[in-house]
């Protein structure tokens, strides 16, 4: 078995004098994305200049990486999931690790652990987690098997038939690496067990079943023996760790299949749940389920943030969790008691045969939502009279009733905010000095529906069963998040398409359940449109009676959102009071701004950081490719610059040799086809002794 290749460019002392670091994804185990550095502040941020760049030299991917910085060394990931160590002051490459496994999907960061002279970087590549020597980049052979563990194992199912990848880094508690994983949106999918591995040996130390086994709490909220066949309820968004209390906070997503739950009737604990687990043992301490029996893909999409707030005159250690719907939930960290009341409200039942939507869902009474949650005709675009009229006519054909309206068979339903939030994977930042939580949000409407599956086995039916859940019946996708497959036969060879189906690519999982004949029929349908019937064959698996018809953005004929602005926002919420300090549109379409239509806000992917220097740094905006610095108290824009590609990631800040840097990974991972894409780390600092690392 190949462990992987590494390239050592220069040795470096990890035992050097202590620096002010960014030691973990989210800035630290609490995930506050806060730095106490003050060299760059409100008075001088306008003087920021590029200090160095590191160009990975790779093409478009969507890594979404926030680097970590330890003792003057920056550790990051390339679009193809190679791991790099850079001199954090110059951008000079120190070493590079190549697992030899192809990958282009999200890889949001790395995990660092040290004990004495043993210093390790844990890096995820597809279904594997590698332990690397932080000084050399070499895989550590006594971790797992030849330097890696396989996340498809230890799930109680045949590993060969599982698709699970680690897209967001886990956390380290003492000598345990605690991880979740991303699973497919539809069955078959593995269970979303939360697992802890020994950081030295790679042995599994504990596992928490998010789909409970017989005798475990929550088992009765699923059909009998669902643990053997149901899937997902997984943690893909990240975690937060209270090191003092020894509690890890784990938000989970929906159960598979996402949109039709006839085979998982019940509340489905612990899907869509914020879990507080004993980090040493995996035992449940408390939990809160945000969506019961989710049939809308309303995962908890962001890592929790551990905060301390003033509540009823007392300091309370709390955990804040943002949602796709635009809510912020706030709980006492130790007990799970909500700091603001939560009301259970009634919602309509599903009309789809076999489905049974939950009768009530929990909603916080404060803070108010940071995204709009119901669409009416008065809220449609006025960009042009023609766009408004088109949107109005289209809207009349849609079902729109606010949150938790079940999808129907045939007529499309509005989901607002859309499938990408509200909040997303970039997370939020918390300022302990002010009690303000900073969260960026998408504010677009999407639509979709269900359709009845047809009997038989053919290339098109295999597509509808396995692929249409994302790409839609007509293969249009929802660019830039989900690419169109129309005409893909002219862009990819059949061999390439076969490899993608087998191995996965980007957000797309692999499909190990499909037989060779199924894959061949599917590939032929994608490449040529030929709907090859598999005579005498049954489908590779029994499909559910109804399937999701795909993710459809509600856009006007010119490709702009069909709702009125703002289409993206940046929000500052006082968690002491539950009130908003400020809210601003976030992002622009350059072509609309040139026509005088400014401050519309846009889709944004990536999160903020906040500093003691009085600043909020954030890139994230899809179309203007800007990196911004805002006054954290007022929301006033103090500085911005245009990146080589959209910064669809979360920045980091650190100090080396007395100099503060702010770094962002520019990839264009969420950009539209034809827009720049690649992988460039860009570090900024105040003028003086700047250098250019160049392409490595």
Question: Where are these predicted regions, by residue range?
Answer:
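N-terminal signal peptide c-region/cleavage motif recognized by signal peptidases
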Residues: 11-13
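N-terminal pre-domain segments of enzymes
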Residues: 17-39, 353-388, 392, 537-546, ...
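Bacterial N-terminal signal peptides that target proteins for export
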Residues: 1-9
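Repeat-blade elements of multi-bladed beta-propeller folds
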Residues: 22-26, 62-80, 104-129, 162-186, ...
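Periplasmic c-type cytochrome electron-transfer domains
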Residues: 28, 371, 378-396, 403-408, ...
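Extracytoplasmic electron-transfer domains, predominantly the class I c-type cytochrome c fold
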Residues: 165, 247, 454-457, 461-535, ...
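Mature N-terminal segment immediately following signal peptide/propeptide cleavage
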Residues: 17-59, 66-69, 92, 570-573
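Extracytoplasmic/lumenal domain signature
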Residues: 43-57, 83-103, 116, 129-161, ...
């Amino acid at each position: 078995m190949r462990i992987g290749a590494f390239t050592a460019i220069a040795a470096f002392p990890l035992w050097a004098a202590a620096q002010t670091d960014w030691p973990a994804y989210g800035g630290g185990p609490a995930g506050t994305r806060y730095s106490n550095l003050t060299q760059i502040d409100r008075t001088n941020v306008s003087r920021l200049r590029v200090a160095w760049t590191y160009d990975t030299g790779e093409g478009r991917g969507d890594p979404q990486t926030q680097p970590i910085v330890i003792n003057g060394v920056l550790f990051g990931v390339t679009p193809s999931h190679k791991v790099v160590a850079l001199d954090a002051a110059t951008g000079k490459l120190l070493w590079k690790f190549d697992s030899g496994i192809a990958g282009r999907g999200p890889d949001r960061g790395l995990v660092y652990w040290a004990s004495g002279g043993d210093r390790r970087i844990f890096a995820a590549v597809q279904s594997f987690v590698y332990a690397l020597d932080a000084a050399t980049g070499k895989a550590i052979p006594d971790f797992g098997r030849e330097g890696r563990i396989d996340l498809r194992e230890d799930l109680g199912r045949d590993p060969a038939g599982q698709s699970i990848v680690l897209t967001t880094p886990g956390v380290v508690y003492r000598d345990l690496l605690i991880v979740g994983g991303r699973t497919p949106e539809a069955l078959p999918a593995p269970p979303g067990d939360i697992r802890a591995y020994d950081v030295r040996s790679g042995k599994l130390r504990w596992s928490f079943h998010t789909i409970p086994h017989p005798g475990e709490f929550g088992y009765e909220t699923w059909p009998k023996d669902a643990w053997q066949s149901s899937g997902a309820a997984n943690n893909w968004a990240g975690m937060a760790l209270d090191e003092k209390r020894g509690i890890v906070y784990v938000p989970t997503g929906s159960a598979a299949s996402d949109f039709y739950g006839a085979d998982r009737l019940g509340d489905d604990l612990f899907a869509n749940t914020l879990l507080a687990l004993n980090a040493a043992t995996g035992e449940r301490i408390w939990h809160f389920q945000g969506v019961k029996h989710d049939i809308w893909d309303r995962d908890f999409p962001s890592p929790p943030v551990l905060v301390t707030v003033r509540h009823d005159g007392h300091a309370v250690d709390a955990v804040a969790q943002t949602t796709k719907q635009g809510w912020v939930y706030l709980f006492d960290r130790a007990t799970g008691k909500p700091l603001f009341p939560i009301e259970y409200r009634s919602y309509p039942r599903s009309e789809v045969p076999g489905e049974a939507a939950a009768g009530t869902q929990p909603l916080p009474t404060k803070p108010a939502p940071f995204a709009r949650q119901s669409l009416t005709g008065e809220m449609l675009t006025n960009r042009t009279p023609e766009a408004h009229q088109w949107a109005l006519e289209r809207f009349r054909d849609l079902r729109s009733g606010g949150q938790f309206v079940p999808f129907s068979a045939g007529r499309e339903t509005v989901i607002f905010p859309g499938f990408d939030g509200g909040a997303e994977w970039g997370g939020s930042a918390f300022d302990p000095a002010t009690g303000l939580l900073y969260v960026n949000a998408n504010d677009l409407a999407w639509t979709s529906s269900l359709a009845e599956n047809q009997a038989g086995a053919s290339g098109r039916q295999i597509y509808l069963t396995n692929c249409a859940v994302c790409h839609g019946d007509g293969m249009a996708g929802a660019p830039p998040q989900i690419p169109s497959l129309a005409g893909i036969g002219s862009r990819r060879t059949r061999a390439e398409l076969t490899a993608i189906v087998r191995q996965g690519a980007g957000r797309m999982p692999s499909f190990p359940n499909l037989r060779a004949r199924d894959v061949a029929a599917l590939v032929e349908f994608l490449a040529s449109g030929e709907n090859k019937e598999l005579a005498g064959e049954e489908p590779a698996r029994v499909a559910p009676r109804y399937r999701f018809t795909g993710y459809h953005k509600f856009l006007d004929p010119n490709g702009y959102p069909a709702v009125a602005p703002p289409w993206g926002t940046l929000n500052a919420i006082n968690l002491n009071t539950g009130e908003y300090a400020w809210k601003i549109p976030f992002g622009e379409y350059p072509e609309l701004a040139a026509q005088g239509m400014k401050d519309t806000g846009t889709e944004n992917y990536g999160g903020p950081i906040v500093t003691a220097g009085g600043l909020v740094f954030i890139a994230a905006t899809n179309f203007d490719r800007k990196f911004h610095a805002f006054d954290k108290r007022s929301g006033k824009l103090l500085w911005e610059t245009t990146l080589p590609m959209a910064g669809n990631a979360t920045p980091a800040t650190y100090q080396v040799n007395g100099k503060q840097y702010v770094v962002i990974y520019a990839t264009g991972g969420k950009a539209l086809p034809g827009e720049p894409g690649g992988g460039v780390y860009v570090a900024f600092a105040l003028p003086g002794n700047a250098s250019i690392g160049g392409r490595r």
